[in-house]
């Protein structure tokens, strides 16, 4: 874990521990007056005890060094996940006043993360939930996703998020529908596999 906030590390440790996630290294770079996020990130890539790298960012000071490290991390199949403050105007102002770092608009940061293979997350909790899901896995080609759910409301939230990410929501194949029918599971004709009443 690399953080631009020292105080937040305590909260991050307890949240990670609650999910059974340990940390090989915890580094706070503060306002990066000495070490930068990119420099520490580069060191973590070669650390055998580190399987995934989590970033807590208030702003991005040296985008080039982070980008270069991200390329190396990708080659070593070590995912980088980042939670960045300052997605709103108020959040950007606070981040700048606290660390003095460049707090770019959310869309700019999202594009930067996507370009360099960094997985950006919108919620702090997601920072801890994602590593087990992405470690050692290659991104699947294509942009089609089938959603299996036990709640219509939750599925609608997922569908919303998929649409925002430019992913296509597709229904189950005829083969899957037939397999479910043989198990006495009937699903609707829509693009979701809703098992609420199954």
Task: List each language-model region with its residue ranges.
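Catalytic-core regions of core metabolic enzymes
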Residues: 2-198
